[in-house]
A protein has these predicted regions:
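Short hydrophobic targeting helices and cationic amphipathic motifs
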Residues: 3, 8-9, 13, 24-25, ...
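N-terminal hydrophobic alpha-helix used for membrane targeting or insertion
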Residues: 4-7, 12, 22, 72, ...
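Cationic, amphipathic, low-complexity segments that mediate targeting or membrane/lipid association
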Residues: 10, 20, 32-38
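Bacterial Sec-dependent N-terminal signal peptides
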Residues: 37-90
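Extracytoplasmic cell-surface/polysaccharide-interacting catalytic and binding patches
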Residues: 46, 81-163, 170-283, 295-320
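Conserved metal-phosphate-binding beta-hairpin within the catalytic cores
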Residues: 288
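Short, Lys/Arg-enriched alpha-helical microdomains
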Residues: 292
Length: 320
């Protein structure tokens, strides 16, 4: 049934966009990338083919653009119904049985849960973050305890920005990404980028390693100065400055070049994490995933609250 509806929609939508001027199609083409990028490009060749057949250029009609945006969103929903990945498992909403509250296992960490606050790239508290706590799978928390113990010997504590992230939060990110007019925090988190490219360039995606429970966002806190260590750019900055392998002095746009001190600080964090089984992410200096994560294909949905864990038999302060 979904396939029949999708085919009918495609035929009629192509007829509509074939009658539109090139400038209008250019924006249609771009919006299609945003809404369909993570769906596997199943409709993308259609938009591309029609776009390439147009040669005239006229001002875009606002009414058509608005209608096209709605059509793109509708198409994205239809494709999602028929493009399920059998390797992905969505856990039951109440299933938090393999998770712990991070501070129960690693009491020395400092918490700054950005998505519980309004200081994040959206500017609002994110759904699913019901309490300002961090959770991880037991395996990831145990490994992070070893990282923390090693870094304390070097004069550092770990500062946590995010751990387990409910799927509803990721869904909210995607909804926000489609609304290209909501740019409240642009000057702080993506000043160099048009919001429309955040999904195509994979700064935001439908699925996140955080939702599997063994990914952590964090930085270093200097115990001597009692300040967060300077890594050269802020957490959740969308841009080249966030790449951990940016070299000292390399031009990176709006941010001042990374200094040798910034680079060295990033490497202190990266080495400590890798020494205890975490792998870095090449686009974010703060992001690490347990290499041998226990749920590589399972995405969890329970909210971030102690009640999620207290409902599990035998849970008490992180010990089963």
């Amino acid at each position: 049934m979904h396939q029949e509806i999708e085919n009918y929609f495609i035929m009629n939508f192509v007829k509509i966009i074939q009658s539109q001027p090139t400038n209008c199609l250019r924006d249609t083409f771009y919006m299609a990338k945003i809404t369909l990028f993570v769906r596997g490009f199943r409709l993308f060749p259609i938009f591309a083919g029609v776009f390439l057949t147009k040669v005239k250029s006229k001002p875009m009609k606002i009414q058509f653009f608005a209608g096209t945006l709605l059509c793109c969103i509708f198409a994205s929903c239809l494709v999602g119904c028929s493009n399920n990945d059998d390797s992905i498992v969505i856990a039951p909403e109440a299933d938090a049985s393999q998770f712990v509250v991070l501070t129960d296992v690693v009491p020395d960490v400092i918490l700054e849960i950005r998505y519980y606050s309004t200081y994040n790239f959206i500017g609002r508290r994110i759904p699913g973050y019901d309490e300002p706590i961090a959770m991880l799978t037991r395996q990831a928390a145990d490994s992070l305890k070893k990282v923390s113990d090693d870094l304390i010997k070097q004069g550092y504590r770990l500062k946590i920005f995010d751990g387990y992230r409910p799927q509803k939060a990721v869904d909210y990110f995607m909804q926000w990404a489609v609304d290209i007019n909501d740019t409240l925090m642009k000057q702080y988190f993506y000043p160099e980028l048009d919001k429309a490219v955040l999904v195509p360039q994979e700064y935001i995606a439908e699925k996140s390693g955080h939702t599997r429970g063994s990914t952590i966002d964090l930085t270093l806190f200097d115990m001597a100065t009692e300040k967060e260590v300077d890594m050269g750019c802020t957490y959740d900055y969308f841009g080249v400055a966030s790449h951990p392998d940016v070299q000292p002095g390399q031009a990176i746009g709006a941010y001042k070049p990374i200094t040798q001190e910034h680079y060295d600080n990033r490497m202190i964090l990266q080495k400590a994490m890798m020494d205890h089984g975490f792998k870095p992410y090449d686009c974010e200096w703060w992001h690490f995933t347990l290499d041998n994560e226990p749920f590589p294909n399972t995405y969890f949905t329970f909210p971030l609250t102690r009640k999620s864990l207290e409902a599990q038999a035998g849970y008490s302060s992180g010990k089963f």
